[in-house]
Amino acid sequence: MAVTASMVKELREKTGVGMMDCKKALAETGGDMEAAVDWLRKKGMASAQKKSARVAAEGKVTTLSLGSVGVMLEVNAETDFTAKNDNFCTFADTATKLAADNGCTDIDTLKALDYPGTGRNVGDELTNLIATIGENMNLRRIERMEVSSGLVSSYIHAGGKIGVLVALESTASADALQELGKKLAMHVAAAAPQFLNRDSVDSEAMEREKSVLIDQARASGKPDNIIEKMIVGRMDKYYADVCLLEQAYVIDPDHKVQQVVDAAAKELGCPVKVTGYARFQLGEGIEKKEEDFAAEVAKVVQG
């Protein structure tokens, strides 16, 4: 019996397995849909869809800098053990390289790219990896940064727990900007700024902070003219906490980040501008299931 595209589509919808593997299963079973499902289950592939319901909050953040272009990717798995698996790490690194080489700015585009040496695309290779390793995994998010001239520097902290990109626009060579870029990326990893500068502060966040500060100042019983000066000072402190260029430089807290950039520009003999940054912390925002170890032991003992 000839295997049709609609049959492959139906089997994929039933199992969550990649197109090529579905086609092979149908070919091996003479087009028998139920037999094809069983064939995939025996190969450990059809279980991948069920695993997708499990929380994947571990994994790793990967980065790749290609001079004026930088890419960062977060790939999640269920356990830290799997995050150190060679096949998982190879997949994460390969996906990052593919994203950089093909100009990817979103996960769907990345998933559609051919995964080298497999006959599958990136999304289907991920499904295959889920079935092989036996854990849910997820290509969670991607960031791509580019400058017309200069360097996009990258940094990985704690073996992939935190990743950073920093974009430096400058006529200086990428090599000349390497040290500054790396140190600024390390600063971002440690200080976790929320915005690049005052101009990029979200207006809602700014008004919310200002409202809180006004209420606090009024509670002190000070007159309005004094309160106004207090708010200006406290907002300056707020900006110094959340804006990268106004933060105290972690390597030299006596200087702000912008001062460090200005000093580097003077030394290089040309302007240097930080045009953007991105920071991924592994698993941030993912709600993890809290395990009650004592309850688990009791359950096992009680049978």
Swiss-Prot record:
State one Pfam family annotation. Answer: EF_TS
Assign the protein's first listed, main location to one coarse class.
cytoplasm
Might you report a single GO cellular component term? cytoplasm
* InterPro entries the record matches: EF-Ts_dimer_sf (IPR036402), Transl_elong_EFTs/EF1B (IPR001816), Transl_elong_EFTs/EF1B_dimer (IPR014039), Transl_elong_Ts_CS (IPR018101), UBA-like_sf (IPR009060)
The alphabetical list of record keywords is: Cytoplasm, Elongation factor, Protein biosynthesis
* UniProt-annotated location(s): Cytoplasm
What SUPFAM superfamilies does the entry give? Elongation factor Ts (EF-Ts), dimerisation domain, UBA-like
- Region Involved in Mg(2+) ion dislocation from EF-Tu: start-end pairs: 79-82
User: One GO molecular-function annotation for this sequence?
Assistant: translation elongation factor activity
Say which family it is in.
Answer: Belongs to the EF-Ts family.
The protein's job, in short, is: Associates with the EF-Tu.GDP complex and induces the exchange of GDP to GTP. It remains bound to the aminoacyl-tRNA.EF-Tu.GTP complex up to the GTP hydrolysis stage on the ribosome.
- HAMAP family assigned to the protein according to its UniProt record, in alphabetical order: EF_Ts (MF_00050)
Q: What name has this protein been given in UniProt?
A: Elongation factor Ts
Species of origin: Magnetococcus marinus (strain ATCC BAA-1437 / JCM 17883 / MC-1)
